[in-house]
């Protein structure tokens, strides 16, 4: 084998985490190789996950606004509308992202290589190129950012035509009249609310009594209520016995304690698993955990100190924002540059309809720690902006310590929740008191007024 090409840093995977790691290394003046097995840059986030689903979501919201604005007219989607029509902006969005990122990589002198990469030893990478050739590379530091793929259980025959996963869902040609979704996590709930708003009859099934078990229960109850108002159905506490295509027109889902559910299409949304089967981890002295991830420390170092793992490789929460920060931290630590303290408050945003967001402690967590925290609530119907926008069905919760002095957390369900949460994030990072929200003036009319209303509710003013 020829002499390996030497780099300072090799990054495997060009998703959000890998991009940030590579750029951070290059900005420090180091030789960086970024290896990506797909043709495009951005990973599943750009091509099969975040960007496509949010583009479809925006189309659903725009259509809903058209319906509301033209209430006097009989506005309906054509029964045979194609998914591609609803995603007509997606190609432009992806193209703009790809152009921008390619320019960024070139400007920073990063070597972008396409192929499948695996370890030969703890410092050497063997890459199979797209034309079948092989190339070996070596580096002082290696950052693994290979992302994840849908976790499809063996007892559900995903065929990507009738029974789909989140990677193949948007490859459907036509908007289905009915859709069953198995899994009440983030992906399942986001797609359930989007397709329900588009007029599809959606049945969301989960083992838990309520979806999104990690979220504030009051917010989830609010979401489920609005989902069902859109025509959706939630079946909680269910055990799926069998999923099969009947060979004619329906996917049949057999439940243990309920009648079978029939639908044109079915989405399996039971989480994701890290992509590591091609990496030959054993050659580098690495072993995956029982959950199929890699264990890392606060600097994203694995058990082999010069090998780092970031993003979906290290498990939940599967947030692009978290992954990008991990990529940055890993690269800086590998180069002995100041890393800074890890962010203690990472906002969680869920792009359901309506949106949900959380930062800090929710009510349940605060009760475990403080026993009697104070809770302030602001209903969106109390602010003029929500009424103007026709989005009065929302709620902001503010959690404070028992004295009503210190802010502990903020949870929001409703329009612009994923933007609003950053006010709470900034306040938490600065150690703001509840009085802070009362003493400050917010623009009128805005959704941000809900912070002041919730603070007043805590203090009984």
Name the predicted role of every residue range.
Residues 2-7, 24-30, 36-177, 208-212, ...:
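Glycine-rich flavin
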Residues 10-38, 51, 55-62, 335, ...:
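Flexible, glycine-rich terminal cap/loop adjacent to redox cofactors
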Residues 10-12, 117, 136-147, 182, ...:
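Short hydrophobic core segments
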Residues 13-16, 39, 182-185, 312:
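Glycine-rich Rossmann-fold phosphate-binding loop(s) that bind the pyrophosphate
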Residues 17-24, 163, 188-191, 197, ...:
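Short glycine/serine/threonine-rich phosphate/pyrophosphate-binding segments
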Residues 29, 199-201, 231, 431:
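Glycine-centered short loops/turns at secondary-structure junctions
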Residues 50, 146-201, 205, 234, ...:
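Glycine-rich dinucleotide-binding loop and its adjacent helix/turn
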Residues 159-176, 260-333:
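FAD-site-proximal beta/loop scaffold in flavoenzymes
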């Amino acid at each position: 084998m020829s002499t390996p090409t030497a780099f300072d840093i090799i990054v495997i995977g060009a998703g959000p985490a890998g991009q940030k790691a590579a750029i951070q290394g290059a900005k420090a003046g180091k030789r960086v190789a970024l290896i990506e097995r797909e043709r495009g840059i951005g990973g599943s986030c750009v091509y099969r996950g975040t960007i496509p689903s949010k583009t479809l979501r925006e189309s659903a919201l725009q259509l809903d606004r058209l319906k509301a604005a033209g209430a006097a007219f009989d506005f309906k989607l054509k029964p045979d509308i194609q998914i591609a029509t609803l995603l007509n902006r997606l190609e432009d969005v992806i193209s703009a992202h790809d152009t921008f990122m390619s320019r960024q990589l070139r400007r920073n002198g990063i070597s972008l290589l396409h192929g499948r990469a695996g370890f030969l030893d703890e410092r050497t990478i063997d890459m199979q190129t797209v034309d079948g050739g092989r190339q070996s590379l070596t580096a002082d530091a290696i950052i693994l950012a290979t992302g994840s793929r849908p976790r499809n259980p063996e007892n559900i025959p995903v065929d990507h035509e009738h029974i789909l996963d989140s990677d193949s869902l948007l490859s459907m040609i036509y908007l289905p009249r009915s859709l069953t979704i198995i899994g009440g996590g983030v992906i399942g709930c986001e797609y359930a609310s989007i397709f329900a708003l588009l007029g599809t009859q959606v049945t969301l099934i989960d083992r838990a009594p309520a979806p999104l078990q990690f979220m504030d229960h009051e917010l989830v109850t609010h979401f489920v209520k609005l989902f069902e108002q859109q025509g959706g159905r939630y079946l909680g506490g269910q055990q799926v016995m069998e999923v099969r295509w009947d060979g004619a027109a329906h996917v049949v889902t057999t439940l243990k304690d309920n009648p079978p559910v029939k639908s044109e299409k079915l989405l399996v949304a039971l989480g994701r698993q890290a992509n590591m089967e091609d990496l030959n981890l054993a050659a580098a002295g690495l072993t995956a955990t029982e959950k199929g991830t890699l264990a890392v420390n606060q600097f994203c170092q694995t058990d082999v100190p010069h090998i780092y793992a970031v993003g979906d490789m290290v498990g939940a929460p599967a947030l692009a924002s978290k992954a990008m920060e991990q990529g940055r931290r890993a690269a800086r630590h590998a180069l002995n540059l100041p890393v800074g303290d890890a962010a203690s408050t990472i906002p969680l945003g869920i792009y359901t309809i309506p949106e949900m967001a959380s930062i800090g402690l929710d009510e349940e967590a605060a009760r475990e720690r403080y026993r009697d925290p104070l809770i302030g609530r602001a209903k969106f119907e109390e602010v003029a902006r929500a009424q103007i926008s026709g989005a009065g069905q929302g709620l902001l919760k503010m959690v404070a310590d028992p004295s009503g002095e210190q802010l502990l957390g903020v949870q929001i369900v409703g329009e612009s929740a994923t933007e609003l949460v950053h006010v709470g994030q900034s306040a938490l990072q600065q150690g703001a008191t509840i009085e802070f929200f009362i003493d400050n003036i917010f623009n009128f009319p805005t959704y941000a007024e809900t912070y002041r209303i919730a603070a007043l509710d805590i203090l009984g003013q």
